Regions:
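Conserved nucleotide-sugar donor-binding catalytic segment
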Residues: 125, 145-225
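Short, well-formed alpha-helical segments that are part of the catalytic scaffolds
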Residues: 18-31
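Short beta-strand/loop segment that forms part of the nucleotide-sugar
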Residues: 36-45, 68-70
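Catalytic core of nucleotide-sugar-dependent glycosyltransferases
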Residues: 208-216, 220-249
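Glycine-rich, basic loop-to-helix element that forms the pyrophosphate-binding segment
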Residues: 70-87
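Conserved donor NDP-sugar-binding/catalytic core segment of glycosyltransferases
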Residues: 105-138
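Short aromatic/hydrophobic "clamp" motif used to bind/position activated sugar donors
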Residues: 92
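A conserved acidic beta->alpha catalytic loop
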Residues: 43-52, 100
């Protein structure tokens, strides 16, 4: 379906048995003055909790949401791709139910940037990792380092996901790749790589932030943690055999191993220094009130 010229952005929300996550997204957005966006919610849940939440929210907000109950369920990746196939906006943003906008004017800020820079194909947003039990947060990756990494070879994303979750990746709808259903661990980064190989015409919007909830025991990441090593091994073999990548991040020659070891040390030092910096200067003080506002509806529901 061709993008509707009147719609600038499609916010795509796949959900599965987690109405609280959808609640956090919807009640964290100010949609009163947003006229250039559509919101699509595609639901794989076997129960009607999400549908009830949508009905209640639309009565209060007067904002129309396109809601689809998948019968039968499509599975996570099938649901994501179905949302992308249904998007009508010029740009699309896929926001999972454990991700959320930090500020209520998130959509209007993003639309303003898209209108100001209409020639861009990709907008990268900043990502904040949020730990709801403690109320603390840390940057996914410091902005300066992220800016530098965005200039590196796209295949480095297979080594380190410096973009973050799909909610931090806004892409022109007609160019947005589809997620590879044969992947689990590398499914996000593989899509980013495919898009960056098509176009490096991107802009990093460090002032527009999304939160990523950490520590959920029923997340996809948690469900595969016990077999992660085997999954990564199989997927690397698949990527080598089907995508044709052959660089230092996949090879097993001595030089590649040395480079990966040095990179591992650098990355570890960067992670430690980021945490120390966050503690010393209280990085959370900037978005802390906004993050509390974002997670507060969950605590009160």
């Amino acid at each position: 379906m061709k993008p509707n010229t009147e719609l600038l952005l499609s916010l795509l929300i796949p959900v599965f048995n987690y109405p609280e996550g959808l609640f956090r997204i919807l009640y964290g957005l100010n949609l009163k003055n947003v006229k250039q966006c559509e919101v699509l919610v595609f639901d794989d849940s076997p129960y009607n909790g999400v549908e009830k939440l949508i009905d209640e929210w639309q009565l209060k907000s007067k904002f129309n949401i396109t809601y689809v109950r998948n019968i039968p369920a499509l599975g996570p990746i099938g649901n994501w791709n179905n949302l992308l196939d249904s998007a009508k906006g010029k740009f699309s943003l896929l926001m999972h139910h454990d991700e959320f906008p930090i500020e209520p004017d998130f959509l209007s800020q993003l639309c303003a940037k898209i209108e100001t820079f209409p020639d861009k194909d990709i907008f990268i947003l900043d990502c904040i990792l949020v730990y709801p039990e403690s109320g603390k947060s840390t940057p996914h990756i410091p902005s300066l380092i992220k800016s530098l990494l965005l200039r590196s070879r796209p295949t480095y994303l297979y080594r380190r996901n410096y973009i973050g979750p799909s909610a931090a990746f806004v892409c022109r709808t007609k160019s947005y790749p589809r997620f590879d259903e044969r992947l689990m661990w590398f499914v996000d980064v593989d899509l980013y790589v495919q898009m960056f190989l098509k176009s490096r015409n991107y802009m990093y919007l460090s002032n527009i932030k999304v939160g990523s909830l950490q520590g959920r025991k029923d997340s996809i990441t948690a469900s595969i943690s016990s077999s992660l090593k085997d999954i990564k091994g199989r997927e690397i073999s698949y990527l080598l055999n089907t995508k044709g990548f052959n660089d230092m991040w996949f090879n097993n020659d001595l030089a590649s191993k040395i480079i990966r070891s040095l990179e591992f040390v650098f990355w570890g030092l960067m992670r430690v220094s980021t945490k120390i910096f966050s503690l010393l200067v209280n990085h959370s003080s900037i978005p802390r009130a906004l993050i509390f506002r974002a997670i507060k509806p969950i605590n009160n529901k």
